[in-house]
Amino acid sequence: MNVNIKTREYTTVTEVSGPLMIVEGVEGVAYSEIVEIETPTGEKRRGQVLEVREDLAVVQVFEGTSDLNTETTKIRFTGETAKIGVSLDMMGRIFDGTGKPIDGGPEIIPEKELDINGSPMNPAAREFPAEFIQTGISTIDGMNTLVRGQKLPIFSGSGLPHNELAAQIARQAKVLAEESEFAVIFAAMGITHEEANYFMRDFERTGALERVTVFMNLADDPAIERIITPRMALTTAEYFAFEHDMHVLVILTDLTNYCEALREISAAREEVPGRRGYPGYMYTDLASLYERAGRIVGKEGSITQMPILVMPQDDITHPIPDLTGYITEGQIVLSRDLHRKGIYPPVDVLPSLSRLMSGGIGEGRTREDHSGVSDQLYSAYAEGRDLRDLMAVVGEEALTERDRKFLKFADEFEKRFITQARDEDRSIEETLNLGWELLSLLPRSELKRVREEHIPKYLPGAE
């Protein structure tokens, strides 16, 4: 065995398989320890210890295992976990999935080196999420409100415009009447070059890049890198939020690619698979990402998460959206039917939900009538959708005058409330006023979910 005790350098690689390599005869190696690898050609790569069994270590190589062999590859265990150097200079910069600048700018001079796995928030130190975050999108602001410190995922499908929606939220999101700075951290995992170019062009064209920090893992980058990309982003978010009192919105896309990377690594390790081949610990792994959102008592800053995931075959019961739903505080669901009608953003408000909405709306936060308007819009749109199904069976002639008004409401709701331009930034006032305009299409006797004193104040044409 050829071992340098001081540097813990080994040349005892016994197997190379996929993204993994097995090193024998190791001593004092720890789980998640960072490894430096020197290829036979002298190229330097990095990896991480996945598993330790007696004198054997399983290492995942971030840059892939091509050109590595079992004879001359050198392995050095650093004794440290994966870290990222953080600084406020990261604002407006673009990094790859491992935290290296890829925008042609200078290297970041770090103010701190932080472990990318973070440290869990003490539940007793958490402050309940509150304070409205305005995204400029009516279906979110008006009916599925995002609040500061919440984790609210977007469930999409293949071919739906979740990338456009993510870019729009990154551009427009803001906390109203707050002096603290607002920042966006955008982490992309497994996206194509075309998608990456779209995001970069959009951020640069609109000037949003000034307040956005981007971490980009592309589809042809190693799958292993996808596991650390969101952790790099969240560690940076924690630094901005809890060291510099900033309100940080973290957008993670696409968590489905992240989970596929988890499955790939699990298969390479020959672990016993869980549901649909995903590892049994996927729930715990996702929770280690989602639970890094929140607010801490005594700290001004906050981390709000909007993870985006593409549901395979639009199946909301698939393990990825299913497990995500257990951990997060609601969901925004994109609809293929609305997309076929040419509606953008195709948010289906009926299965969508923000569980923490009540803490972020109302007088002093948005407007006194917000809750009632939202409930009434939900109720009326749900009835209009039911009547569409009924009309398909019995015909329009069988509907009453009241039924026709609800049908018209559902159509107008989709055309005017859900639909908006890709660069349209609606204020919460505009969203609520539009809601009242649509409610004016219904008989006043049907407005049972809004407070009576709000009707003459906000309903157009009311006395």
UniProtKB/Swiss-Prot annotation:
Gene3D superfamilies: 3.40.50.12240. The keyword Transport applies. The keyword Cell membrane applies. One of its GO terms (molecular function) is proton-transporting ATP synthase activity, rotational mechanism. Keywords: ATP synthesis, Cell membrane, Hydrogen ion transport, Ion transport, Membrane, Transport. One of its GO terms (biological process) is proton motive force-driven plasma membrane ATP synthesis. It is a peripheral membrane protein. It comes from the Archaea. Pfam families: ATP-synt_ab (PF00006), ATP-synt_ab_N (PF02874), ATP-synt_VA_C (PF22919). It is found in: Cell membrane. One of its GO terms (cellular component) is proton-transporting two-sector ATPase complex, catalytic domain. Disulfide bonds: none annotated. InterPro entries: ATP-synt_VA_C (IPR055190), ATPase_a/bsu_AS (IPR020003), ATPase_A1-cplx_bsu (IPR005724), ATPase_F1/V1/A1_a/bsu_N (IPR004100), ATPase_F1/V1/A1_a/bsu_N_sf (IPR036121), ATPase_F1/V1/A1_a/bsu_nucl-bd (IPR000194), P-loop_NTPase (IPR027417), V-ATPase_su_B/beta (IPR022879). Belongs to the ATPase alpha/beta chains family. Has multiple subunits with at least A(3), B(3), C, D, E, F, H, I and proteolipid K(x). Component of the A-type ATP synthase that produces ATP from ADP in the presence of a proton gradient across the membrane. The B chain is a regulatory subunit. HAMAP family: ATP_synth_B_arch. This is A-type ATP synthase subunit B. It comes from Methanothermobacter thermautotrophicus (strain ATCC 29096 / DSM 1053 / JCM 10044 / NBRC 100330 / Delta H).
